[in-house]
């Protein structure tokens, strides 16, 4: 059988787009090999690299740090067996010092247009920020683990092993996802020193999300944090998860549960561009096992993207606020403010960001930081 090789604007266009209805805005540039009708393999690559300067971040504790970092490097592979069976395999260069890992390895089986079964390793249902991740968020950086703690405290960067029912109803306006997962990885990279092995009863983690789009529908399971002026969005989402004995220390085990509510508004043609507002509320409960990871969190952000290009791309200034209130008496509350600007060259495939941040941990002095990041996806 002859294989036809051609370059496409999306590494997921044939193999993954059909399965998950991920909008073209979030797709990668890449290459697709077609084997026949509805049979293909696609390959892509993404990376985020940055320069940062952090107050008192140098080894002497009093000077500013000056560091270049490769924050993320991913290989994207997706495939299509037929019009109803698709799959993906995505990797990350490193997770919490544990080296190269598979973050997504799953198959998607479309039962009917309104229902697709996901099985394997993938993002379990959660808030918009975690479903979008650092590559598809307003300015990136949700992995700071302040408000949206799923990406930071969610196993394989927010992923888990399990199965979920995913789909859209009401002409795509109502999105739903509900699944069962292995769990017990909620604090995999949290840096807790007193985590212990599970010795009590075993139980799965159950997670779900509902989202309603009042204006333009948002197709797809893996989401987008900002549509960069491409859509009119008014959306509200709720998510929750729970697992018996999902929090285990060296001396105690308890139920892990959390829920969140998130909101996104984007409007095109507001003056010379498009405006966006986002907000979210989180409640985390570890059954008093890890009080430092138990509490309430808040986030809010706003952005404005200019329609007229300047040189290669468009400017998008933005602001963001995050706060986590811990229940621990000895732990600290955290607040972070970001002010920045994105230079959008080709959607989420090519952009540069410059961000000034101020972080306040209760009981300590404020720490400011300046970060310039480059994101490229092929």
Predicted regions and their residues:
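Outer-membrane beta-barrel pore domains
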Residues: 4, 32, 36, 61-62, ...
């Amino acid at each position: 059988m002859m294989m036809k090789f051609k370059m496409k604007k999306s590494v997921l266009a044939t193999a993954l787009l059909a399965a998950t209805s991920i909008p073209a805005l979030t797709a990668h540039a890449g290459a697709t090999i077609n084997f026949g009708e509805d049979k293909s393999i696609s390959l892509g690559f993404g990376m985020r690299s940055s320069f940062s300067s952090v107050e008192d971040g140098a080894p002497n504790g009093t000077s500013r740090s000056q560091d270049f970092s490769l924050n993320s490097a991913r290989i994207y592979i997706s495939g299509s067996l037929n019009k109803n069976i698709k799959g993906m395999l995505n990797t990350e260069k490193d997770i919490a010092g544990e080296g190269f890992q598979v973050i997504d390895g799953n198959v998607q089986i479309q039962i009917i247009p309104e229902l697709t079964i996901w099985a394997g390793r993938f993002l379990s249902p959660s808030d918009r920020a975690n479903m979008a991740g650092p590559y598809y968020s307003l300015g990136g950086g949700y992995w700071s683990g302040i408000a949206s703690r799923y990406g930071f405290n969610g196993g394989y960067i927010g992923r888990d092993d399990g199965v979920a029912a995913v789909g859209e109803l009401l002409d795509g306006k109502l999105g739903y996802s509900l699944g069962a997962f292995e769990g017990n990885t909620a604090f995999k990279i949290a840096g807790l020193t007193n985590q212990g092995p599970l010795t009590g009863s075993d139980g799965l983690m159950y997670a779900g999300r509902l989202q309603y789009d009042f204006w333009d529908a948002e197709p797809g399971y893996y989401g987008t944090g900002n549509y960069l002026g491409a859509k009119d969005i008014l959306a509200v989402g709720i998510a929750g998860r729970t697992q018996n004995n999902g929090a285990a220390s060296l001396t105690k085990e308890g139920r892990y549960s959390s829920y969140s509510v998130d909101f996104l508004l984007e409007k095109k043609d507001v003056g010379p561009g498009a405006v966006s507002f986002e907000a979210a509320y989180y409640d985390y409960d570890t059954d008093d096992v890890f009080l430092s990871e138990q509490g309430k969190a808040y986030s809010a952000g706003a952005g404005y993207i200019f329609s007229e290009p300047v040189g290669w791309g468009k400017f998008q200034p933005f602001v963001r606020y995050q706060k986590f209130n811990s229940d621990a008496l000895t732990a600290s509350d955290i607040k972070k403010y970001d002010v920045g600007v994105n230079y959008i060259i080709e959607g989420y495939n090519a952009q540069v960001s410059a961000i000034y941040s101020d972080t306040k941990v209760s009981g300590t002095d404020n720490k400011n930081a300046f970060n310039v990041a480059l994101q490229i996806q092929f």
